[in-house]
């Protein structure tokens, strides 16, 4: 069960009748750098933009969830046209925080006071529940972390990219940098959140940065990460080869491997075999997304146990290139296993 202490803060951004967008309140606190990033993400600072009702992402190891609404009558908010509720947390669980934020939005629309929102926030922190007759209720134990991790659809990813999904699988297995572009943030969030499922054995969603702007503070934050899945709505990201090993153009269904990653990402018989396996599993109408993820994970564990068995015979259970050569693998397979051993920290340096 997700624990209430995972929430870090609650914030409120308003756009007034003069079209000014400002931070108006937060509890207990949000630092200035994060506030600046949240203003950029909330869509209220942009002119003539479509309203993005819910976005999420990660900055400096903090997850943020932003729900934005247009003020509707009847309301006590006479000078406000739109507002965004910002929740920051330690955990990845978009559905949980979207549901909680909807309750907070209704509360603020009705009362026009952050105090009422703070009461709801504290109730969830202390009791795991926030109840109200007119604004709806929220129960934290309804939102299981595993469900959040499984909510992205790998079957959709495979149906779009087919055999090329093996490029994404290889990149994630080797902890490479994957950049995904789509002009529509909703499509970007839906696609990117599914990719860590390809490496389910790690259950590591900290690699996910689904909504990044081409701004220095965000790019510097990204560059300190070893490998990642980063989503961008700006088409100029395709020219930023310093940011990616693999570039995914979602609208055009194209995947490109950058020049500097081609050696580590070279494909062979093993890749073809895994690629076929992934496609067959995903195309089976009787199999759910969760079953497809499990199938791929079992296949991955087979590969890793083969690596481990080689390492068992080696010095300190660490692999060397010489150990791998004893397996007499084809060059592309040997190359992949060598880079995989490095990614899994099984390599003797």
Curated annotation (Swiss-Prot):
GO BP annotations listed: endosome transport via multivesicular body sorting pathway; protein transport; regulation of early endosome to late endosome transport
InterPro entries for the chain? FAM45, Tripartite_DENN
Q: Where in the cell is it found?
A: Late endosome
| dDENN domain location | 296-349
Q: Record keywords: Secreted included?
A: no
Keywords on record: Endosome, Guanine-nucleotide releasing factor
uDENN domain boundaries: 1-135
What would be an example GO MF term here? guanyl-nucleotide exchange factor activity
What role does this protein play? Guanine nucleotide exchange factor (GEF) which may be involved in the regulation of late endocytic pathway homeostasis, including endosomal positioning, maturation and secretion.
Protein name according to UniProt = DENN domain-containing protein 10
Question: What's the source species for this entry?
Answer: Danio rerio (Zebrafish)
The major lineage groups are: Eukaryota, Metazoa, Chordata, Craniata, Vertebrata
